[in-house]
């Protein structure tokens, strides 16, 4: 080893072999970070042919990290193979003669890298030009090398042609098999000088060292967010592009990350491996279990920096913070109404489509929102599980309890930007704001009369239908409005209806 920046590997020639004397950069690995053994081949630009395609594909240190992680198949321009490699692990690690010397004129004018064949130089130039002539017919994703396209297409076909002889586990890419085989050999020649942890691959060590240095070399050009690993960066980019390349074969639902698809597949399999030790309730995702367990512990680890209010979930905190900022980033394309959460917008869209996917099994009544269905079911069971700790009054829904508790605290967190009047609930504020805007979104289907509140529309409809839902408990006389019943009951000397 010459210095922290480079080293020379020499192999004594035997019969039928030639001397290999290669010097390359170690891309920032400090002295001592690379130890002996076969890991040394991962730092050489040229690898003896009989070392196997697996070793040749690992020839350039850091190449896999720069181009997308350890699972990347190198193209011919990188020293890999353009086409399928061996279908199982290499038979041996014996050495063969070094590759042929470069042909005259096979040197890149951009970076000076030399190649043994002109075809490799042509393919290498795509690194500089950004050309990607190989397009996937399934999803349209493009690649610079045909070998990368072949590997990518196995995502769609599910093909995993590279099987481990030790355990039978199969992989889409040969480089993934080579990486996996290190778990059997136990060989970890690359040691971190900061913490002493050892790794089987130099590229993994390079990635690991970023946990010590805090380096984040992958920056998003859209929002400036930086990442330590290219794989995390690529997943983040899908937030901007909307790409969801991982689709469920059972229902077609697509996901931006393969891990999310794996979690989703458990729904079809009926698997709920994460059970609550307190009540036995099981969940598909461990995150769901973590959130649920806070209902037993009353833990609320996400406090608001503005007002100190704490929440069980980070998404609840994010939603709450928008009550301070007034931000409503999710806008309906039909009517322009904006919402704090994307899930609220999805539910609101059903107002325009008329979709009511949540039906009651008891009476068949359908609802656009699942929360409304759950609340409705309690009208059949009579359950009111949400009780006020101050006065004992019980409610069918948690939102009803939350709204009621403000009557004890006197808190009115929702203020009108026009006149400053404050309200206990956001729905009350929205109704009030219509007085300023003149909006009357609730229109009678019988006479086209419009109203500010839905309750006013429901009351008005009874003039058309003749419905009288409020009956006197003394004499049985029915009324269309509660206020009329209250007036009537005074004649009996009784109290007004609650």
Curated annotation (Swiss-Prot):
A zinc finger (C2H2-type) spans 106-128, 134-156, 162-184, 190-212, 218-240, 246-268, 274-296, 302-324, 330-352, 358-380, 386-408, 414-436, 442-464, 470-492. The keyword Cell division does not apply. Keywords: DNA-binding, Metal-binding, Nucleus, Repeat, Transcription, Transcription regulation, Zinc, Zinc-finger. One of its GO terms (biological process) is regulation of transcription by RNA polymerase II. One of its GO terms (cellular component) is nucleus. One of its GO terms (molecular function) is DNA-binding transcription factor activity. It is found in: Nucleus. It holds the Pfam family zf-C2H2. InterPro entries: Ikaros_C2H2-ZF, Znf_C2H2_sf, Znf_C2H2_type. Residues 30-104 are annotated as: Disordered. Its main location: nucleus. Belongs to the krueppel C2H2-type zinc-finger protein family. May be involved in transcriptional regulation. This is Zinc finger protein 497. It comes from Homo sapiens (Human). The lineage of its organism: Eukaryota, Metazoa, Chordata, Craniata, Vertebrata. The gene is ZNF497.
């Amino acid at each position: 080893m010459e210095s922290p920046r480079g080293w020379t590997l020499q192999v004594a020639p035997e019969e039928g072999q030639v001397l290999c004397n290669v010097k390359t950069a170690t891309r920032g690995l400090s002295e001592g970070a690379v130890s002996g053994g076969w890991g040394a081949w991962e730092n050489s630009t040229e690898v003896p042919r009989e070392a196997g395609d697996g070793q040749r594909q690992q020839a350039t240190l850091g190449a896999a990290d720069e181009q997308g992680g350890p699972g990347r198949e190198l193209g011919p321009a990188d020293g890999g193979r353009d086409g399928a490699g061996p279908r199982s692990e290499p038979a041996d690690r014996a050495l063969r003669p070094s590759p042929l010397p470069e042909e005259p004129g096979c040197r890149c004018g951009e970076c000076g890298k030399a190649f043994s064949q002109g075809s490799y130089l042509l393919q290498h130039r795509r690194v500089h030009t950004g050309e990607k002539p190989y397009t996937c017919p399934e999803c349209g994703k493009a690649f610079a090398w045909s070998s990368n396209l072949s590997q990518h297409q196995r995502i769609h076909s599910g093909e995993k042609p590279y099987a481990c002889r030790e355990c039978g586990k199969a992989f889409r890419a040969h480089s993934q098999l080579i990486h996996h085989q290190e778990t059997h050999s136990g060989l970890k020649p690359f040691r971190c000088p900061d913490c002493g942890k050892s790794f089987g691959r130099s590229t993994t060590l390079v990635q690991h060292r970023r946990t010590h240095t805090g380096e984040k070399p992958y920056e998003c050009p859209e929002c400036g967010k930086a990442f330590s690993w290219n794989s995390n960066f690529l997943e983040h980019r899908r937030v901007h592009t909307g790409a969801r390349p991982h689709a469920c074969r059972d229902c077609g639902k697509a996901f931006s990350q393969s891990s999310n698809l794996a979690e989703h597949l458990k729904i079809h399999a009926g698997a709920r491996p994460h059970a609550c030790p307190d009540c036995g309730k099981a969940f598909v995702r461990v995150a769901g279990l973590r959130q649920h367990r806070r209902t037993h512990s009353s833990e609320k680890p996400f406090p608001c920096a503005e007002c100190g209010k704490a929440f069980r979930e980070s998404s609840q905190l994010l939603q709450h913070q928008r009550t301070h900022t007034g931000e409503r980033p999710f806008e309906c394309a039909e009517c322009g109404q904006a919402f704090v959460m994307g899930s609220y917008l999805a539910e609101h869209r059903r107002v325009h489509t008329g979709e009511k996917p949540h039906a009651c099994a008891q009476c068949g009544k359908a609802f656009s929102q699942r929360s409304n269905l759950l609340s409705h079911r309690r009208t059949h069971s009579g359950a009111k599980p949400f009780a006020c700790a101050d006065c004992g009054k019980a409610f069918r829904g948690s939102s009803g309890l939350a709204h009621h508790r403000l009557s004890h605290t006197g808190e009115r967190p929702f203020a009108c930007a026009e006149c400053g009047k404050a309200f206990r609930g956001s729905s009350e504020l929205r109704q009030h704001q219509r007085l300023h805007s003149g909006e009357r979104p609730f229109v009678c289907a019988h006479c086209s009369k419009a109203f500010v509140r839905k309750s006013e529309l429901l009351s008005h409809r009874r003039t058309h239908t003749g419905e009288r839902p409020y009956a006197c408990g003394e004499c049985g006389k029915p009324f269309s409005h509660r206020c009329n019943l209250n007036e009537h009951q005074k004649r009996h000397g009784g109290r007004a209806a609650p």
